Structures are given as structure tokens and as C-alpha cells.
């Protein structure tokens, strides 16, 4: 996947992830808007966010370099990426990361099943949920019946 995504997009999504981890919706929403305005596909951005939360999951264990190298092989990343994410993962509990996975998964399913009116709106709502905005929990939409088209 890394070869399909240019470095600028990854860098911007990293900034988006940092804003989400800080629960800073005022920074996260404009970053997402910029990424979408640049023509990035919501599914691609969702995949990158998921990948970054996977790295955060491993980084949250505060690994030493040897352990980070083993972890990196398991997720096809680099030990450097895991070590860089360690500082951002310090304030996150495993439950926070699990909750983020649930939100990202709900967004993905809502897009793929047609429950989302627009992919962009679904992704924005997901980012807002990840930032802790009340009422933005996209998992609730999975409990509803799919719209008839």
C-alpha cells in the first residue's frame, strides 16, 4: 500500500491522525477537507487512518527498538514509524485504540453498504467521532436498516 500513496498524503494523514489523537476537531476537520479537496478518495484516506491506528496500537506498548523491529515486520511497517508514533500513543489507552478501530470499521461498512449518503460526509463524521464530538458516533448508523435505493 505504501507504494501507492505518495509521501505528501501520508504526511497530511499523519497530521490528521495527530489532531484526532489530541481530539482537536478544529484542526482535524480542515485537514480532512484539504485532503478531500486535493482529490483523495475517502476510502484511501480511511485505509491510511486505519493503518496509522494500527501503528499506534503497537506504539502504545512503548517498545524498545528490538521489539519495535519485530512489531514492524508483523504489520509491514518500519521500526522507525513505530518509534515515532510512541510519543503520540502515550496518552492513549488500548480501549481508545479499540474504539477508534470500531469507528473506522463502522465508517467503512456504512460506505460499502450504501448506508452513507456520501463517502465524504461519512468520513467527516468518523473523524468527528474519533475527536470525541458528541453525537458523531457512526456506529449507530449500522444498527439502522439500509436505505432502499
Label for each model-derived stretch:
Residues 37-59, 96-149:
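Amphipathic alpha-helical interaction/assembly segments
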Residues 1-99, 134-135:
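Small-residue-rich helix-loop
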